[in-house]
Curated annotation (Swiss-Prot):
It comes from the Eukaryota. It comes from Tetramorium bicarinatum (Tramp ant). GO terms for cellular component: extracellular region. The keyword Ribonucleoprotein does not apply. The lineage of its organism: Eukaryota, Metazoa, Ecdysozoa, Arthropoda, Hexapoda. Keywords: Amidation, Secreted, Signal. Expressed by the venom gland. This is U17-myrmicitoxin-Tb1f.
Length: 59
């Protein structure tokens, strides 16, 4: 009976360590961010909060 409990505990411990290592690997490799080059707005336009070029009105 005692050997069965030890085996079950070892299996659970192995699974937990595998899940933790998988999670750590996912967190470390998730930081690959692709940066898109930004373009400039034409004269008389400015970028709004969404990044779209909007015409500037002088009043």
């Amino acid at each position: 009976m005692e050997k069965n409990r030890t085996t079950t505990f070892s299996v659970y411990l192995t699974i937990i360590l595998f899940l933790i290592s998988t999670f750590i690997t996912m967190v470390i490799t998730e930081s690959n961010i692709i940066r898109v080059p930004e373009f400039q707005c034409p004269n008389g336009y400015r970028k709004d909060a969404n990044g779209k070029c909007r015409e500037v009105f002088h009043g």
